[in-house]
Amino acid sequence: VVATVTEEKRMRENWNGVAIVDLSREFLNSNGAERHADVHVLPGTVWQPQWAGSTFAEKLENLVGDLNVCSQKGLGERFDSTIGASTVLMPYGGKYQLTPTMAMAAKLPVDGETTTCSGMAWGFNPYLTEADPYRGAYMAVVESVTKLVCAGFRHKDMYLTFQEYFEHLNTAPERWGKPLAALLGALDLSLIHI
């Protein structure tokens, strides 16, 4: 037995005969203590990709030498992608097995065989998001949804989840403006187009 539902408006948890948790239903409904913050969203700036070099050849060489762009096949070959026996897509595809897979697909764990799978993809450009959190989050949704659609998933069946990585916010309204702008960018695209 994990839990027993009673008519009492309290959530109680016992361990070895000792009550270790005793919370009122009103507190649970409140989602904790109420908090407020002042927020000021600064206008975003334009991000223009820049690569070191004076000629096209130098810029291209610096671009493909960037760890965010270069091939990660050697690293991927060090891991067994078939562990768990539910993987649908291999890490690399194409005629020569050199094209990285842009999404993850795995069969659902059920008894017997299944033709149903779940998919997952991500999108994020740290440079764009640093310059304009609203546009960065907006484009992160575009990128992740596009990857899944290209992998064969229907955009109407997708659920979005968001992870945020921002500096410690303290009480500075401008700092609070960054996650708010990112949330609004992701929400804007999600409500209108997906």
Predicted regions and their residues:
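Glycine/proline-enriched, intrinsically flexible loops and inter-domain linkers
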Residues: V1-I192
